[in-house]
Amino acid sequence: MKKYINKTEKILNENVIYLDLETLGLSKNSPIISASFTKENQIITYVLTNLKEEIELMEIIYKETRDKLIVTYNGDRFDLKLLKYKGEKYNINFEFKSLDYYQVAKKYSYLFESENLKQSTMEKFFGLYREEDIKGSQVIECYKNYLETKDEKYLDLIGKHNSLDVKGLIYLDRIKDYVEDKMSFFYENKKFLIKEINFEKDILYVEGKTNSNNLYFSNRVYEIKALENNFYLKIFTEKALYNKNTTCNYIFLKENFLKSQIESPENILVYYDHLVAQ
């Protein structure tokens, strides 16, 4: 294996590891040819010089990730599932506690003005533009070229790309603060962080975390209560015909929590709409 070491630009939590893998395909049988992860404020990258080294790489990953929170981008669906499968193959018992920033971005996708949720797109959303790098789709071609020519420049390209993926992953720590800022509101000088929003029978239900306890207030528009750092908000709506094709639920503009795409009349907030069946 060829090993690369790069310094991180921020001091990292020693109980957290940022991880990204490169493979020769998307199936569970595809060889893992490269792994990049953080350790002691460094980004460590290993690239296989031959496919038989995969088991050695799995043993390294197991040792480094054990008992740590693993941060990935789409890792819950790919990287970690693949490691589980490889662990069964090589008799390595992978157990993961993970944070997947792709799942966070997907859940709150309406907060991001971006064309898609690819890692590179989200990096640009937060202001990170990569230095010269190959595309992820070129990794397989590079490795095949290495196997044919034994020219290590191809390993270097893969190692750099893998390392930059982890560098970008660290940068995407900003997602947490961004989402918290966008999903928070203040009431009576207390902070409320929205975790769930549901709509049922003309009532909007909002739940989340707060630094307030033993709070209760209600009027004709909404009811809010807080207990043991959890809050529960119910917003009571009115339903009417917006035009001949669209009905809407609305409240008079007093408390603003959620807004529809369609234009609202003055002093009224339309926050849910749907087409009337033709």
Predicted regions and their residues:
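DEDD superfamily 3′-5′ metal-dependent exonuclease/proofreading module
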Residues: 1-19, 24-32, 37-278
